């Protein structure tokens, strides 16, 4: 295995998971804060807000999981390594 390809793959895997976690992390914090504000303003809508909140958390977390899959593929099933 070419050392340059190996080093580039490790750096790319680290960037993939790191950058894939930043966006959803910021988004989840923002959404949770807005949900708390919404529940404080309208306590009777708590169930509807909570359901929407959990669904949006699942969509945001899927982006992080996709980044993890890309990182694992770069580390263990690297398509750039010659056979």
From Swiss-Prot:
It is found in: Plastid, Chloroplast thylakoid membrane. GO terms for molecular function: lipid binding; proton-transporting ATP synthase activity, rotational mechanism. The chain crosses the membrane at residues 3-23, 57-77. It holds the Pfam family ATP-synt_C. The keyword Transmembrane helix applies. In plastids the F-type ATPase is also known as CF(1)CF(0). It comes from the Eukaryota. Belongs to the ATPase C chain family. It is a multi-pass membrane protein. NCBIfam families: ATP_synt_c, PRK07354.1. This is ATP synthase subunit c, chloroplastic. F-type ATPases have 2 components, F(1) - the catalytic core - and F(0) - the membrane proton channel. F(1) has five subunits: alpha(3), beta(3), gamma(1), delta(1), epsilon(1). F(0) has four main subunits: a(1), b(1), b'(1) and c(10-14). The alpha and beta chains form an alternating ring which encloses part of the gamma chain. F(1) is attached to F(0) by a central stalk formed by the gamma and epsilon chains, while a peripheral stalk is formed by the delta, b and b' chains.
């Amino acid at each position: 295995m070419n050392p340059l390809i190996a080093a580039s793959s490790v750096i790319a895997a680290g960037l993939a998971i790191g950058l894939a976690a930043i966006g959803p992390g910021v988004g989840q914090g923002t959404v949770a804060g807005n949900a708390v504000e919404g529940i404080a303003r309208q306590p009777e809508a708590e169930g509807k807000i909570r359901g929407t909140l959990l669904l949006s958390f699942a969509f945001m977390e899927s982006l992080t999981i996709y980044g993890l899959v890309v990182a694992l593929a770069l580390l263990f099933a690297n398509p750039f390594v010659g056979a």
